Amino acid sequence: MVYETGNETVDDAVQRALDGERLDRTDGLALLAQPVDELAAGADLLRRHFSDGTVDACSIVNAKAGNCAEDCGFCAQSAHFDTGIDTYGFLDPEDILDAAKRAEADGAQRFGIVVAEKGVSKEKRPDEWDDVIRAIRLVRDETDVEVDASLGVLTEEEAEILAAEGLNHYNHNIETSRRYFSEIVNTHSFDDRLKTLHRAKAAGMDLCAGVILGMGETPADRVDAAIELQEVGVSSLPVNILNPVEGTPIGDREAATISRTELIKTIAVYRFLHPEARVRLTGGREVNLDPDEQHLPFEAGADGLLTGDYLTTDGQTPADDIEIIERAGLEPNREANTFDPESVKARHRSPAAETASNANRTNATTETDD
């Protein structure tokens, strides 16, 4: 035995993962039942073995907001629900580049262009598609961040074009388990999401696909979602925690239906089931974890985060995120974007500091007022 927590189930799973065995649903459920401290310790060992000792930060821009025809029950941007958010069409590619440059200055290693719609269609909206391609090229050519995108469903042709343009990761979350998906979404199927992931991967892009925890799913659903992602093969697994938005079908609850301990255990199990992926803590962490708790997932297998603001809700500053990473005894990834963490922390102590997403909101408001 390479490492012993004193917990036979955890120690056995650690050894098998180190030996290259892919753990299955039975393993995931058994691990989820173990005490959190021992489970987190085992997951942390796997992170140290398979990862590089850094936490990888990504940032996003809400490049097209609201009026989405899909009915995802958690989403403030669905046209089916009255949530009061600002809506706007696809941003000018130069504005997206500006947001990417701010993300670069804030230490992001990758920058995601995100749209609120079922899919950016080359055939049905060619002008918008051309703007997407132009934005990808600008970020690719004029920054050091890796350019990612979340553009909804893709055809095979669209996936091949995006891959040829150098898109690094394609994000398309599965949100939850196959069993629970229809409780949250009715306008498309779980398999629709999987088809897009398979097309993106077949075209040569890496996959970023994950879940939202605390929507009423069971612990078994959380494991089942991770098993589905094993079959797809993801290199980045974002873990969102529900931040209920008033006006959505699940917006009337006060908080996500997951405790801090359950969250930590789920992240640890995801490390066991996806030992070589970036397990990335993303939306909802600030409202579901106290400031002095946010380092805990990074002591339980997590090694990535989304920094700055989210699509329609505020995040915390990149300086705060760097301090959380350091509190966990880790350091920010600087492989693609060799930034100075101390400079980021110093700059964001100023009240005038502006993250990429904050700046985008200014752009969006300006467009709405025209």
UniProtKB/Swiss-Prot annotation:
Superkingdom of the organism of origin: Archaea
Pathway, per record: Cofactor biosynthesis; biotin biosynthesis; biotin from 7,8-diaminononanoate: step 2/2
GO biological process: biotin biosynthetic process
Keyword RNA-binding: no
EC numbers for this chain: 2.8.1.6
Reactions it catalyzes: (4R,5S)-dethiobiotin + (sulfur carrier)-SH + 2 reduced [2Fe-2S]-[ferredoxin] + 2 S-adenosyl-L-methionine = (sulfur carrier)-H + biotin + 2 5'-deoxyadenosine + 2 L-methionine + 2 oxidized [2Fe-2S]-[ferredoxin]
Chain ranges of the Radical SAM core domain: 50-276
A GO molecular function held by the record: iron ion binding
The keyword Glycoprotein appears for this protein: no
Region ranges (Disordered): 328-370
Binding site for [2Fe-2S] cluster: C208, R280
Cofactor: [4Fe-4S] cluster; [2Fe-2S] cluster
Binding positions ([4Fe-4S] cluster): C68, C72, C75
InterPro entries, A to Z: Aldolase_TIM, BATS_dom, Biotin_synth/BioAB, Biotin_synthase, Elp3/MiaA/NifB-like_rSAM, rSAM
Free-text remark on how the cofactor is bound: Binds 1 [4Fe-4S] cluster. The cluster is coordinated with 3 cysteines and an exchangeable S-adenosyl-L-methionine. Binds 1 [2Fe-2S] cluster. The cluster is coordinated with 3 cysteines and 1 arginine.
Entry-linked PROSITE patterns: RADICAL_SAM
Keyword field: 2Fe-2S, 4Fe-4S, Biotin biosynthesis, Iron, Iron-sulfur, Metal-binding, S-adenosyl-L-methionine, Transferase
Residue ranges with Low complexity bias: 352-370
Family: Belongs to the radical SAM superfamily. Biotin synthase family.
HAMAP family membership: BioB
Protein's job: Catalyzes the conversion of dethiobiotin (DTB) to biotin by the insertion of a sulfur atom into dethiobiotin via a radical-based mechanism.
Name the record gives this protein: Biotin synthase
Recorded name of the encoding gene: bioB
